[in-house]
């Protein structure tokens, strides 16, 4: 872990985190990079196995994180201020959502376990089961809906 991170920073209110601490809060699951279907009439939201074309399916990280908006302008910019608008679609296990809701991080989170592989070992990441949006037309995404995320 980077030396510019305060001990137990993840227990602080999100608004008190430094930019480096904010970024370090991500558990690396990759679930936020899954495309979602949102039904306007019901507001229902369904995750699909169809991932952003920039997601590395093995590492579950963005291939071009720093400049991702040049390639995917609609990619969400999560900040402490924007989180309120986005938290409803974030996975229940997401560290940002958990902390926003005042809950602790999961035991498999690397900040708790000390190992960035535990998110994958615990089966909490998208490693190995996504398909790139470059390979699936949007009209077929409903064929890739995930029943239980």
UniProtKB/Swiss-Prot annotation:
Transmembrane segments: none
The organism's place on the tree of life at top rank: Bacteria
Family: Belongs to the UPF0260 family.
Protein name: UPF0260 protein RCAP_rcc02083
Organism, as annotated: Rhodobacter capsulatus (strain ATCC BAA-309 / NBRC 16581 / SB1003)
């Amino acid at each position: 872990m980077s030396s510019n991170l305060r001990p137990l920073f993840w227990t602080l209110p999100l608004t008190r985190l430094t930019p480096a601490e904010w970024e370090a809060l991500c558990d690396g699951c990759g679930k936020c990079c899954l495309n979602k279907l949102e039904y306007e009439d019901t507001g229902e939201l369904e995750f699909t196995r169809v991932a952003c074309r920039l997601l590395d399916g093995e590492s579950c990280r963005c291939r071009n994180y720093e400049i991702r908006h040049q390639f995917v302008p609609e990619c969400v910019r999560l900040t402490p201020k924007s989180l309120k608008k986005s938290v409803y679609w974030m996975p229940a296990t997401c560290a940002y959502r958990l902390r926003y809701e005042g809950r602790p991080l999961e035991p498999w989170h690397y900040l708790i376990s000390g190992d960035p592989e535990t998110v994958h070992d615990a089966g909490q990441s998208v490693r190995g089961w996504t398909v790139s949006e470059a390979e699936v037309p949007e009209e077929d995404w409903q064929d890739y809906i995930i029943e239980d995320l």
